[in-house]
Design a protein with these regions (language model features):
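Compact beta-sheet-dominated domain cores in extracellular/mature segments
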Residues: 2-124
Length: 124
């Protein structure tokens, strides 16, 4: 192999190596966004859409202090805590809708979707 061919081969290998950088890590999607030991609610089915992450709850998802886009807009949950959670139709934990058992993950029954305004842990 001539010197020019060797130089071209080495240069080509160096260019190829520089373009094969590792791909950046992908951001978590769906239910995988829910951290351990938290109650997570999602605006879409199957853990899609806006996520709300809770340790103790929120007495009014419609006010300015909580996550945006979840008031009367929760379709799926993942309860990663060792306690039951209550979902309520009104602010201040009134107008009960349903309970979420410890470690439950999935879509809320159709008749209870898009009704929740407050939620909190209710018992271990």
């Amino acid at each position: 192999m001539s010197l020019a061919a060797k130089t071209l081969a080495v240069t080509g290998a160096a260019v190829l190596a520089s373009t094969l950088a590792p791909a950046p890590a992908q951001a978590a999607t769906g239910y995988a966004r829910c951290p351990a030991n938290r109650m997570c609610v999602f605006s879409g089915t199957n853990g899609t859409g806006v996520i709300g992450i809770f340790a103790t709850g929120d007495d009014n998802l419609g006010d300015a202090t909580g996550p945006r886009g979840l008031d009367n807009n929760i379709e799926s949950v993942w309860n990663r805590r060792n306690e039951y959670w209550g979902l309520w139709n009104n602010a201040g934990y009134t107008g009960g809708i349903t309970e979420v058992t410890p470690h439950a993950k999935g879509n809320i029954a159709a008749k209870y979707r898009n009704l929740t305004t407050s939620l909190k842990n209710i018992r271990a």
